[in-house]
A protein has these predicted regions:
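Intrinsically disordered, low-complexity, mixed-charge
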Residues: 1-90
Length: 90
């Protein structure tokens, strides 16, 4: 298991993007969280099998039907704290 951290920019707040990401992560069996950032971006931390996380990055780039993703910056790392589900933090 590895950890992926991403910062997603574009029109990604107020457009159901975090809910879309939570659904995708849950369906793929990933754990972690997503949260809005003060600068208008969305932060994502996900843990799982490398191949599944790579598939998840495709979902991050695609976005919800109302969103418009400009960029996804991804950082791969070893697992820090472990999570039991994928949550939307407020």
């Amino acid at each position: 298991m590895i950890e992926m951290q991403a910062v997603v920019t574009g029109k990604v707040q107020g457009v159901m993007y975090r809910s879309y990401i939570q659904d995708a992560a849950t369906n793929l069996g990933l754990v972690g969280y997503t949260k809005n950032q003060a600068d208008g971006s969305v932060f994502v931390l996900a843990q799982g099998i490398p191949d599944v996380l790579k598939e998840f990055v495709e979902y991050l780039n695609e976005g919800s039907s109302l969103s418009s993703v400009a960029s996804v910056g991804v950082d791969w790392r070893s697992v820090g704290a472990t999570y039991v589900e994928f949550s939307v933090l407020h």
